[in-house]
A protein has these predicted regions:
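Short loop/turn motifs at secondary-structure junctions
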Residues: 5, 33-34, 135
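Hydrophobic pocket-lining residues within nucleotide cofactor-binding pockets
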Residues: 11-14, 44, 110, 144
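N-terminal phosphate-binding loop and adjacent alpha-helix
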Residues: 10-28
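Short catalytic-loop micro-motif centered on adjacent basic/acidic residues
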Residues: 8, 78, 136-139
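Cys-nucleophile CN-hydrolase/nitrilase-fold catalytic domain and related Cys-dependent amidase chemistry
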Residues: 18, 27-98, 103
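Active-site catalytic loop in hydrolytic enzyme cores
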Residues: 84-145
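Extreme N-terminal starter segment of soluble prokaryotic enzymes
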Residues: 1-8
Length: 145
């Protein structure tokens, strides 16, 4: 089985400004080709903030942007965002395929030293899916298997 080529992107995030952060990532993604997976930072739309879900972009907008980038790069685009959901605010790791299929995982082990557990609902299930012949188990910073 061929290996996966993975790129991990990092940048100083504009605090609590989703559109500005997406513009920065647009520029970073312009010339990336030949990758299987591109990973964005935790809470890539807002920065790691406890109140981020209250000011976050709607999930549909984040997924639409990720889908466009997945199509542009022909890669799985992955990154977490603070989102409001029917269960309350979550730190949701989204993984979007070029064809539009969306996988998601809600962070299970919240970072207590930053009081993340007081601001976000913990996920309650492991997610495993296949991408280009590889089984992928998404995790977010501080998650433990």
């Amino acid at each position: 089985m061929p290996g996966l080529t993975i790129s991990i992107l990092q940048q100083p995030l504009v605090w609590m400004d989703g559109p500005a952060n997406l513009r920065h990532f647009d520029r970073q993604l312009e010339d990336i080709t030949g990758r299987d997976v591109i990973v964005l930072p935790e809470m890539f739309t807002t920065g790691f903030a406890m109140e981020a879900a209250k000011q976050s972009m709607p999930q549909e907008e984040v997924v639409a942007w990720m889908h466009a980038k997945a199509q542009q790069t022909n890669a799985l685009i992955a990154g977490s965002a603070a989102l409001q959901t029917e269960r309350g605010p979550v730190n949701r790791f989204l993984l979007v395929e070029p064809e539009g299929k969306v996988h998601f995982y809600d962070k299970r082990h919240l970072f207590r030293m930053a009081d993340e557990h007081h601001h976000y609902e913990a996920g309650n299930e492991r997610v495993v899916f296949e991408w280009r012949g590889w089984r992928i188990l998404p995790l977010v910073c501080y998650d433990q298997i």
